[in-house]
Amino acid sequence: KELYSLILFSGTDPDPRNRDTSRQRPFIDSEFFNFSYGRAEDGDRVIDAQYATSTRYVSTTMHGNATMFGVNFADGRIKVYPIGRDPRGRTKTFCVLYVRGNPDYGKNDFVGNGDGTVTDRATGLTWMKVDSAGLKAGPRGDGTLNWEEALEWAENLEYAGHADWRLPNAKELQS
């Protein structure tokens, strides 16, 4: 969650075959953090700008390799990456940003509120325990909503004595 917290959702997704990055915007604030796209002269694609985390994935991927979570600031995705060899047989290398400070950052601290909601004391966010299907939300009454319907439903929702519900943003949903 630490590395994910640095993602800017205003980046542009590059064409991995295009070598010109002059009109691209990375998904990290390059005013504060050094960033470079993958370099063709190193045998990389433009999108080869994966940053490693210390969080291992519980299973394996790509030819049974052990895997860890990472963030790609070239294309704005959180992914799992093989630890060891890449699909081309090369030792997989990553960019790394080191962090210090609160080791409990990103750890949820849930408490049930007894009213069908849960508060995460770490973030201050209150979540509903049930999803839209449990509420029979939407025009079809089955909980399936398109994005516009979901926004409108949240705007008019009264639940557990509160009328200020909204859709979470991407970082809140990841929290």
Regions found by a protein language model. Name each.
Residues 2-166, 171-175:
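Glycine-aromatic-enriched surface loops/turns that form tight recognition elements
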